């Protein structure tokens, strides 16, 4: 595949730190030429087999009878007071024409079994509320509904009515449900054991789309949460109106229920009537048929493992594992992202899955070029950055001298490696952080998210490349039509992120709010990945400007880290020092101590030309007033400080003559023996091997 020109320009324009000549070569000729092994916080390679037992069946499996049972309220033994429920039946009026239509649950799945359920809820109110409170609650409900029926708006803040404090947790739960069942147009909220009743504004909103009878029944259905039950709205021949109902339900309750349209034949007219049916979403553990041992009440199960993947994008690997285990991608946690075209080993933790269940899918995932091992129970998830670094074993093939270089190739290679080993390399974020798309890079999506341009971010995400393949044909169709449902039918199953966004857009619509919900279909780590891509791009440009402007000298206004032992990006502000004029003149600090801020709300800028450069860039990108928080997507970007130079550790290398290279492929005459370079080294967390190699070779890799 032809390389992306913009991709090359971005990194070719960044300056180097060392002055050696370098050489040409090819990396990642195959995934086995680029092996990445994560180093955990204890300094251990994660591909080493752990000696401790993988898991103990006896500690994980529980018999169903051993589960603690929730205490249930004995509704049958509650005292009943007849006559207090009569007002409820006057609150809802039906027209004669609606009597034959059964909106709400299907007969076999009806929420209200005769009158028993309604009476039971009313009895709970009568039993727990004194007569005065019960009467005041009924009056409050009548007042709210009368105002809505008379089209009178509720002035100011919505009114509320306090039931009072209910200390018993079970009684509070029963009262919450009883009030919502009796008065679906009200909602209840808890405040320190107090139950407060308010108007249900979503009920009123739904009444603008459907009859009040349907709204009343729908909210009763929703509150009852009866497993395997369905709710059906009245037949509707207006497609746009049905679409509005779909979007309302999915926008407000999409995490709980799903909607579908079904055709029903109208016998009198001979035309099909279409109904919108709602049903509760299947729980993840039921989709994956997870055993009872994974649903221990009050205890979240975490299973750690080492993931080996080959030539596979990390997010694609997580999506595949999630499907096989019946969980969602956000249930996986990891310490860092890994390359696609490589063989990588990394630590991961998945929640709500036992070690035994993970071990059961080993054979299935091998077909996807993945393996899992070192499977064991742990107490918590991983967080980004929770690693010491990565070990790399790399083969660089097709070694050649730079153009017009007459020196010996072997000498050039040794000179370059020793130079970087001694002086270090510029600690740029690697190109894999930004994607290799010709038209759109991940940092452009991140900038749109920072500017709260959600729809633009979606369109950038789904912008096709100039390639004729199923993925890009699907993306092209979406940009032309904004038809999420049609695009889903075209998008290949393995494109997990694209399909997640499209499914959400189908549910919520291609609106600003729908696009926000679509971004929420991706795990938090994926959402913030795009924002980090933008802040990483700016940091790369900043460090290049810093070195071009001041070189290796530490000058007034630079920021330096005072703690030599910190080897990650989590420098506290207390460890960051602003270099004074006197300190700069006295050469008190070395260049390897200089740090630059990665954009965020909790950083300080250098007090020299570099600081002004940051402000100019923010102005250029329309972020002068950006607070680096995107509350609509629950993204907070505090920022951090990153050292401008890094050194490879435990570096070793070997030149290897490879007589087979090119001979088999071209059969041409070889004037000199082809060389390959085997190089191994360790890098700190958030450092990139491709960046280190670029400094060594002085050539794009």
Curated annotation (Swiss-Prot):
It is an enzyme of class 5 (isomerase). The keyword Transcription regulation does not apply. It comes from the Eukaryota. Residues 424-647 form the TRUD domain. SUPFAM superfamilies: Pseudouridine synthase. It catalyses: a uridine in mRNA = a pseudouridine in mRNA. It holds the Pfam family PUS7L_N. The modification Phosphoserine is found at residue 79. Its EC number is 5.4.99.-. Keywords: Isomerase, mRNA processing, Phosphoprotein. GO terms for biological process: mRNA processing; mRNA pseudouridine synthesis; pseudouridine synthesis. InterPro entries: PsdUridine_synth_cat_dom_sf (IPR020103), PsdUridine_synth_TruD (IPR001656), PsdUridine_synth_TruD_insert (IPR011760), PUS7L_N (IPR056963), R3H_PUS7L (IPR056961), TruD_catalytic (IPR042214). GO terms for molecular function: pseudouridine synthase activity; RNA binding. One of its GO terms (cellular component) is nucleus. The keyword Isomerase applies. The active site is at residue 339. Pseudouridine synthase that catalyzes pseudouridylation of mRNAs. Belongs to the pseudouridine synthase TruD family. This is Pseudouridylate synthase PUS7L.
């Amino acid at each position: 595949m032809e390389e992306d020109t913009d991709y090359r320009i971005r990194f070719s324009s960044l300056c180097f730190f060392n002055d050696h000549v370098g050489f040409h070569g090819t990396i990642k000729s195959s995934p086995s030429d680029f092996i990445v092994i994560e180093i955990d916080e204890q300094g251990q390679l994660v591909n080493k087999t752990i000696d401790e037992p993988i898991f103990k069946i006896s500690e994980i499996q529980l018999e169903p009878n051993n589960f603690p049972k929730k205490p249930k309220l004995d509704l049958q033994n509650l005292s009943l007071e007849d006559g207090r429920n009569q007002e409820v039946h006057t609150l809802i009026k039906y027209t004669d024409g609606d009597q034959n239509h059964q909106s709400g649950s299907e007969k076999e799945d009806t929420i209200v079994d005769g009158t028993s359920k309604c009476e039971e809820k009313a009895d709970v109110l009568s039993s727990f509320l004194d007569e005065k409170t019960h009467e005041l609650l009924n009056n409050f409900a009548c007042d709210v509904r009368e105002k809505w029926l008379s089209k009178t708006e509720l002035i100011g803040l919505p009114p509320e009515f306090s039931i009072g404090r209910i200390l018993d947790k079970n009684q509070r739960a029963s009262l919450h449900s009883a009030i919502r069942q009796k008065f679906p147009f009200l909602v209840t909220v808890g405040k320190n054991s107090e139950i407060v009743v308010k108007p249900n504004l979503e009920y009123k909103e739904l009444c603008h789309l459907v009859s009040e009878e349907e709204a009343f029944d729908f909210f009763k259905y929703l509150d009852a949460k009866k497993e395997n039950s369905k709710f059906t709205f009245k037949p509707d021949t207006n497609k746009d109106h049905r679409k509005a109902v779909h979007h309302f339900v999915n926008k407000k309750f999409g995490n709980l229920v799903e909607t579908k349209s079904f055709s029903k034949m109208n016998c009198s007219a001979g035309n099909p009537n279409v109904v919108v049916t709602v049903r509760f979403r299947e729980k993840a553990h039921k989709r994956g048929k997870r055993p009872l041992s994974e649903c221990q009440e009050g205890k979240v199960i975490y299973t750690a493992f080492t993931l080996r993947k080959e030539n596979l994008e990390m997010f694609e690997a997580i999506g595949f594992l999630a499907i096989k285990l019946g969980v969602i991608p956000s249930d996986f946690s990891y310490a860092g992202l890994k390359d696609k075209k490589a063989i990588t080993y990394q630590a991961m933790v998945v929640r709500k899955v036992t070690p035994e269940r993970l071990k059961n899918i080993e054979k299935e995932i091998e077909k996807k070029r993945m393996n899992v091992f070192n499977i064991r129970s742990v107490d918590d998830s991983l967080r980004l950055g929770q690693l010491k670094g990565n070990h790399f074993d790399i083969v660089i093939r097709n070694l050649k001298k730079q153009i017009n270089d007459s020196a010996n190739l072997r000498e050039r290679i040794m000179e370059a490696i020793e130079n970087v080993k001694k002086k270090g390399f510029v600690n740029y974020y690697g190109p894999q952080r930004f994607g290799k798309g010709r038209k759109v890079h991940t940092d452009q999506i991140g900038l749109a998210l920072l500017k709260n341009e959600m729809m633009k971010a979606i369109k950038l995400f789904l912008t096709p490349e100039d390639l004729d393949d199923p993925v890009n044909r699907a993306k092209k169709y979406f940009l032309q039509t904004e038809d999420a449902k049609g695009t889903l039918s075209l998008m290949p199953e393995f494109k997990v992120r694209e399909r997640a966004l499209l499914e959400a857009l189908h549910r919520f619509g291609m609106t600003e709010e729908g696009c926000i919900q679509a971004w929420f279909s991706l795990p938090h780590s994926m959402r913030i990945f795009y924002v980090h891509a933008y802040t990483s791009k700016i940091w790369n440009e900043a460090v290049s400007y810093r070195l071009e402007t001041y070189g290796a000298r530490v000058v007034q206004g630079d920021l330096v880290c005072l703690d030599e032992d910190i080897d990650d990006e989590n420098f506290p502000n207390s460890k960051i020092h602003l270099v004074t004029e006197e300190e700069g003149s006295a050469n008190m600090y070395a260049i390897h101590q200089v740090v630059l801020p990665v954009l965020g709300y909790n950083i300080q800028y250098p007090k020299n030309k570099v600081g002004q450069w940051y402000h100019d860039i923010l102005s250029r990108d329309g972020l002068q007033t950006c607070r680096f928080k995107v509350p609509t997507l629950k993204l907070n970007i505090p920022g951090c400080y990153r050292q401008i130079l890094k050194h490879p550790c435990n570096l070793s290398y070997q030149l290897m003559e490879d007589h087979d290279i090119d001979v088999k492929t071209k059969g041409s005459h070889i004037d000199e023996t082809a060389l390959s370079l085997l190089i191994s080294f360790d890098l700190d967390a958030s450092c990139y091997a491709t960046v280190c190699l670029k400094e060594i070779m002085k050539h794009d890799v």
